[in-house]
């Protein structure tokens, strides 16, 4: 745990309905209990401006390139106003979604879009990538059942199983592309506390 006493950037990734936000919250609470200076944030969002952009992104019908640029603009504000200052102050930053979600939700809709997402990120913030990313691996059929049981929904929630499978395959591909950064946590048959224990082993 000593390596978390200085600033460290941790992200949680995966499709909807996988328990990703739950795990981010559990890790946040655990690190606080260890007297670690830690903040929990999310994307798209995390700042007042970025949250306004999020509302447009998740509810309005945008052209694919417009959607990507909206997500990137929100991230820039989030990084500049919140993430970077916290890291500079020595905090651990836990973020519920980051660049990999943009690749799998917005990048997939564009030709060569995934590479475009990472190239844009290098231009905007060339030195900021997570030290570790947890991909919560839950089968799409299970994930969509969980989403359908929720009362709230946005345009991504209602796209159907084919969309969920496409996003899932994208995250799997990214975990193979960036194996040193992305740690896959197979969670389909595990309880939240069991998943949390697996995550702690990587810290």
Curated annotation (Swiss-Prot):
Pfam families: Thymidylate_kin
Stretches of the chain forming a coiled coil according to its record: none
Catalytic activity: dTMP + ATP = dTDP + ADP
SUPFAM superfamilies in UniProt: P-loop containing nucleoside triphosphate hydrolases (SSF52540)
Keyword set includes Transferase: yes
GO molecular function terms noted in the UniProt entry: ATP binding; dTMP kinase activity
EC number(s) reported in the record: 2.7.4.9
GO cellular component, one term: cytosol
Annotated keywords: ATP-binding, Kinase, Nucleotide biosynthesis, Nucleotide-binding, Transferase
Keyword set includes Transferase: yes
Gene Ontology biological process terms in this record: dTDP biosynthetic process; dTTP biosynthetic process; dUDP biosynthetic process
Residues given in the record as ATP binding sites: 14-21
Function, in words: Phosphorylation of dTMP to form dTDP in both de novo and salvage pathways of dTTP synthesis.
Alphabetized PANTHER family for the sequence: THYMIDYLATE KINASE (PTHR10344), UMP-CMP KINASE 2, MITOCHONDRIAL (PTHR10344:SF4)
Family under the similarity heading: Belongs to the thymidylate kinase family.
UniProt-listed HAMAP family: Thymidylate_kinase
Protein name, UniProt field: Thymidylate kinase
Source organism (scientific name): Rickettsia akari (strain Hartford)
Encoding gene (name): tmk
């Amino acid at each position: 745990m000593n390596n978390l006493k200085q600033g460290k950037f941790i992200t949680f990734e995966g499709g909807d309905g996988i328990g990703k936000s739950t795990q981010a919250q559990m890790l946040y609470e655990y690190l606080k209990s260890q007297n670690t200076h830690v903040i929990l944030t999310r994307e798209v969002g995390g700042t007042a401006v970025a949250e306004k952009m999020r509302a447009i992104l998740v509810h309005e019908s945008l052209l694919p390139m417009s959607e990507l640029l909206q997500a990137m603009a929100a991230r820039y504000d989030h990084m500049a106003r919140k993430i970077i200052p916290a890291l500079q102050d020595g905090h651990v930053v836990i973020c519920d979604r980051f660049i990999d979600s943009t690749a799998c939700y917005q990048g997939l809709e564009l030709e060569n879009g995934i590479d475009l997402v990472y190239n844009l990120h290098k231009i905007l913030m060339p030195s900021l990538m997570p030290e570790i990313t947890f991909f919560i691996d839950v089968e799409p059929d299970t994930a969509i059942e969980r989403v359908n049981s929720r009362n709230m929904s946005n345009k991504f929630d209602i796209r159907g199983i084919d969309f969920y499978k496409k996003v899932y395959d994208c995250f799997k591909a990214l975990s193979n592309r960036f194996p040193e950064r992305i740690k896959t946590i197979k969670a389909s048959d595990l309880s939240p506390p069991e998943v949390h224990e697996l995550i702690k082993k990587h810290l």
